[in-house]
Amino acid sequence: MTVSQVRRVAVIGAGISGVVSTAHLVAAGFEVTVFERNQQTGGICINRPCYKNLTTNVSTPLMRIKLRAWPENTPDFVHHSVVNEYIRDIALSTGVDERTIYGARVEHVYKDGGKWHVNWSVLDDNGSIDGLEERRLISTFDAVVVASGHYHSPHIPDIPGLSEVKKRWPSRVIHSKRYRTPEVYRDENVLMIGGGVSSMDISRDLGPFAKMIFQSTRNGDADPPALMLPDNADANDTILVTNGTQVHNIHRDIFYIPDPTLAFVGIPYFNTTFTLFEFQAIAVTAVWSRTACLPSTTEMRREYLVKQKQTGGGRKFHSLKDKEKEYVRDLMAWINDGRNAHGLVPIEGHTAAWFEAMDKLWDEARAAMKERKEQQEKIIKRIPFSADCTSVELPHLN
């Protein structure tokens, strides 16, 4: 199966990356089926995957997509329920909702005989006492978009001793993905492993409730200045792992090099998410509708290896920190070269309003970061990792 033969497409996930991917593919005439394990669109922005007080840390002008503007007078920073409603409105207005199978669990995706096979299951009401019966199905497609995002599978760092603690006290070690409300940590000592945005936001959320908060990190991307661990600060009641997650052989963080009928939308991090993911969805649509041409497999592989060397590989391969503007500029230039060749109107990349909002965000972020650091230093004691980040020891639990 080549990209010139793509017609039927499976999209896995109905968060923002799945919704915008489906919307653009449908507009281009593709037959799309969306598999969503939850009962509604929204991804991480629906109530169950989010912690109660989660608000956006990227302003709504930066998250505006081409398919739909935010409602008039929407604040710059909003509760996750507002974001979920925005995604839901997009899904309803673009035909995504009617093409989505809700409650569908995708269990296996593989290619055989030139077709992609999606093994999935759904629970049906069979009218019996038990009520529900699992129905397993296999559907075939020409191409697949994996739009489950980079928040779906939590990354647990390989720290000696951590897994043993988790086995012995399962409720005392959780990933930030499982964090919901701060009240359950009232009067507890909490150790945060990781120094990124999740760690900072959850620490602030825990501040009024936890007895003490300790943060263990090595060169976190959002680290405030570290404080030395006090002598009596080795006892912790709960460990929160806030490290991020970590795809190999992909071109432009989108196309699987050995077979570009498999695409990923929503993998990069340290970006403005919604707009970035829509540009990726536009790229997928352009390639599969043959208005944009991918380089040869050899050239894609060469570019991949160059980037691998530049970033050091691993999770940082997908980081767009200080690179988003360049990434989108290059992506849209490539897409528009193809559109020009086909006599199509070019698609605008980042708008003037987006750049204005980005400049405003950076000014506000610097001020907010200063304030947040001051707040955190009042509630967090920081444990500086050694260079090799070797272990976590909880003597009082032995």
From Swiss-Prot:
Pathway, per record: Mycotoxin biosynthesis
Keyword set includes Transferase: no
Pfam families for this protein: FMO-like (PF00743)
Assigned keywords, A-Z: FAD, Flavoprotein, Glycoprotein, Monooxygenase, NADP, Oxidoreductase, Signal
Gene Ontology molecular function terms on file: flavin adenine dinucleotide binding; N,N-dimethylaniline monooxygenase activity; NADP binding
UniProt-listed Gene3D superfamilies: FAD/NAD(P)-binding domain (3.50.50.60)
List of residues binding NADP(+): G194, G195, G196, V197, S198, S199
Assigned EC number: 1.8.-.-
Disruption phenotype: Impairs the production of ustiloxin B but accumulates intermediates such as ustiloxin F and C.
Protein family according to the UniProt entry: Belongs to the FMO family.
Protein purpose: Flavin-containing monooxygenase; part of the gene cluster that mediates the biosynthesis of the secondary metabolite ustiloxin B, an antimitotic tetrapeptide. First, ustA is processed by the subtilisin-like endoprotease Kex2 that is outside the ustiloxin B gene cluster, at the C-terminal side of Arg-Lys, after transfer to Golgi apparatus through the endoplasmic reticulum (ER). Cleavage by KEX2 generates 16 peptides YAIG-I to YAIG-XVI.
Designated name of the protein: Flavin-containing monooxygenase ustF1
Annotated organism of origin: Aspergillus flavus (strain ATCC 200026 / FGSC A1120 / IAM 13836 / NRRL 3357 / JCM 12722 / SRRC 167)
Underlying gene: ustF1
